[in-house]
Structure formats: structure tokens, C-alpha cells
């Protein structure tokens, strides 16, 4: 690991202006990452303007049991997810998603719905054998599965067919920097295979229990007849979300 002062000098010599600010804020909170990793993982969004966007998933992130994984997901939403993710609808054609997932912010609302359906499925006895760690991998995969829906930077429709693989690769690279360890195969594979039978590469279709769980949550949340009033709220209205999100549809009296 680099010493903080040494790292600061080298970052300053290689980057300037806005890029220096974004790199320092996004990747050096503890000044512990190498220059090579910083170059590989330059933020894909406007970091200064989006540092707190993970707040829109506060309730869903709390489903994750591991504090470290919660921190990772917040970091990923704040610093890695491209800007377009926060504004586009979940379906470019408007044919295959419910009304709540259409229009501005639709992809965010869809992602929240996938996380909720995942949590509902995890309450069922057939998933009881999964360890807490593996359940958390499923939760993280649901939250991050569409974060590269049209690429890592600018909106590019041509990248849609492989967006699962692109997202999985970016999550893996970010994981290795964030945790300084290998990325769990089950996590990246669940992201890569979330489209199920529509996954471009047949080798990447759901195989493991977590793969199938994540695909099932995404599939159900994508059905046109689904309507969840709590998620229909404008996600920019944080006060409104705070008021309605705790009333999750599966909570018992």
C-alpha cells in the first residue's frame, strides 16, 4: 500500500482540476489505493453532484446484513454508477415494464422493486438453507444488476444486450479495489445472468440458486401488470419515500 503523502503527490502530478477532485473524493477516502487502480476505476458519474444518491436506496440497502457490503453498495451508487441511471426509464420501448418503471426515474423505481421482491422471496422456506452471506450476495446483485444497462459512461443503446456482463465486470473490479480481495463469483454471476433466458451468452444464464433468485425477482418486477404504490412515488421526494417505504408489502402486523 502507498503511504498517504506519497500517494497524494503522485495523484497531483498525474491528474488535475475536476478529475483530481473526483478521484480524490471517490477513491481515496482513506488514501489507500494504488495509482494503477485509480486509473482503472475513474468514476463513471459526476461524483461531486452525486455523492449522496445512495440515499434513494436507504431502505433497500438496510436489507443487507453485512455492514461492509452496505458500505460497498453505497459507495458504488455514489461514485461508480453512471449519471443516466438516475433519470432513464427501465424499458426503452415501454412494452415490457409496468407503468411505475416508465419515465424519468423509472430504472431507480424498478431497482427498488427488484430488491423488495428479492426480500419477499427470501422469506420463503425453500431459500432458508442459504447462508446470511449468500443472501446478502443476492441482495447486492439485485441492487446493482442494471447499473450498466446502457454502458459504463454515456448512454449507449448498443450495449444493452450485454449489460449484465458489463455490470458484473465493473462490480468485480470495484470490489477488488474496495475490499482488496477477490470478488465472489456468486455475486458477479448473479448480476451477469439476471436476464435469464434472454441473456445473450447461453453460458451466462442462471445456474446457481442465487442466479435463479435474482432472475426471478427481476422478472416479476418487470411484469407490466405489477404496480407498487410506494415505489410509484417520485424518488426525488426523499421525505415522501421516508414516509412510505417502511410500510413494506410483506410486513406482518
Predicted region positions:
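Histidine/acidic-rich helix-loop-helix segments that form or flank divalent-metal centers
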Residues: 129, 138, 178-236
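Post-HEXXH active-site segment of zinc metalloproteases
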Residues: 154-162
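Short, positively charged and aromatic/hydrophobic N-terminal segments
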Residues: 21-22, 26, 33-34, 40
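Aromatic (phenylalanine/tyrosine) cluster motif
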Residues: 6, 12-15, 21, 27
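Acidic/His-rich, divalent-metal-binding segments that scaffold phosphate/diphosphate chemistry
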Residues: 45-155
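An active-site-proximal "capping" alpha-helix that borders the catalytic cofactor pocket
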Residues: 114-117, 161-178
Amino acid at each position: 500500500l502507498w503511504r498517504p503523502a506519497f500517494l497524494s503527490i503522485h495523484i497531483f502530478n498525474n491528474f488535475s482540476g475536476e478529475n483530481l477532485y473526483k478521484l480524490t473524493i471517490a477513491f481515496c477516502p482513506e488514501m489507500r489505493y494504488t495509482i494503477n487502480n485509480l486509473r482503472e476505476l475513474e468514476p463513471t458519474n459526476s461524483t461531486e453532484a452525486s455523492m449522496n444518491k445512495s440515499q434513494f436506496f436507504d431502505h433497500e440497502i438496510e436489507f443487507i446484513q453485512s455492514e461492509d457490503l452496505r458500505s460497498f453498495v453505497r459507495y458504488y451508487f455514489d461514485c461508480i454508477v453512471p449519471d443516466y441511471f438516475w433519470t432513464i426509464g427501465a424499458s426503452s420501448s415501454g412494452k415490457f415494464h409496468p407503468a411505475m418503471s416508465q419515465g424519468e426515474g423509472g430504472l431507480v423505481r424498478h431497482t427498488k422493486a427488484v430488491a423488495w421482491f428479492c426480500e419477499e422471496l427470501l422469506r420463503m422456506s425453500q431459500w432458508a438453507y442459504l447462508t446470511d452471506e449468500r443472501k446478502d450476495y443476492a441482495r447486492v446483485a439485485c441492487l446493482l444488476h442494471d447499473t450498466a444497462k446502457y454502458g459504463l459512461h454515456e448512454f449507449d443503446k448498443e450495449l444493452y444486450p450485454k449489460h449484465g456482463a458489463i455490470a458484473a465486470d465493473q462490480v468485480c473490479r470495484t470490489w477488488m479495489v474496495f475490499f482488496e480481495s477477490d470478488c465472489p463469483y456468486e455475486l458477479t454471476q448473479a448480476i451477469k445472468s439476471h436476464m435469464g433466458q434472454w441473456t445473450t451468452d447461453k453460458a451466462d444464464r442462471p445456474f446457481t440458486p442465487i442466479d435463479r433468485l435474482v432472475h426471478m425477482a427481476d422478472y416479476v418486477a418487470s411484469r407490466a401488470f405489477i404496480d407498487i404504490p410506494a415505489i410509484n412515488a417520485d424518488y426525488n421526494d426523499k421525505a415522501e419515500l421516508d414516509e412510505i417505504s417502511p410500510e413494506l408489502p410483506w410486513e406482518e402486523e
